[in-house]
């Protein structure tokens, strides 16, 4: 009964999203039936550095597949926000996943470990493992291993930007085949992200939860991701609001400028109004535009086939 109600909610949401993101003619077409999401642990035998076996100690991926899974599809790993202390799994996880499904994109919502129990590099290790997992199992899931992106909101945006600036090609000699896969995302989508951990416009709560009360200044600089961008940083789409008083828009602006300086393809949209944590604001006349322009960016960049 619970599963039936859950599926009914997913189908109802899919109907709304499908109507919102198609032409009037296509809006009359019945919404596609989305598959029931499945959740898997990132590590079968327990996560490295785990301090217990509770839910909070077990990073997972919840898999949302679009109706057609013939592939090869684009995939996006979603990192919800929550100041590195909680996770907005609905507004910044499930709803974006459902939207991506309407574009034919496979979505994977990441439940990563959080402060104050866990600090860096645990969170980075979790998202890197997620990227490796999707890439290593790309054939099984009908995914193009060269079209795997990350989407992060707020603190999850910081984590996605960290994955975009701190990655490796994998360990070819690893016994675990997942560890042989590279952790570089092919593109990044950052929604009102925390970027700096050193400037006045940082989000102090996210910084403290990630690094602890007495953060090493050198580590804070290394994880201020606008200072870590190179020509190999993946193409990036950013959106923010000028009215955001929780995570000031300077975070996105300085990241964009660093991408531009490095010659990395990037697009940024700054909306005049809107509070922090918008997620998928389908009823907001202004902010409801960001998923539409994101879809255009994905197509223009060749990330949608």
Please place each PLM-identified region on the residue numbering.
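Bacterial N-terminal signal peptides
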Residues: 10-22
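N-terminal cap/lid segment of alpha/beta-hydrolase-fold proteins
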Residues: 29-70
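C-terminal catalytic histidine-bearing segment of alpha/beta-hydrolase fold enzymes
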Residues: 64, 239, 249-305
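Short beta-strand element of the alpha/beta-hydrolase
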Residues: 72-81
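Active-site glycine-rich loops that stabilize anionic/oxyanionic intermediates
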Residues: 80-85, 242
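Catalytic nucleophile-loop/oxyanion-hole region of alpha/beta-hydrolase
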Residues: 88-90, 94-95, 108-145, 282-289
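Primarily recognizes the serine-hydrolase "nucleophile elbow" in alpha/beta-hydrolase
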Residues: 129-206, 220, 225
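Short beta-strand/loop motif that positions the catalytic acidic residue
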Residues: 238-240, 244
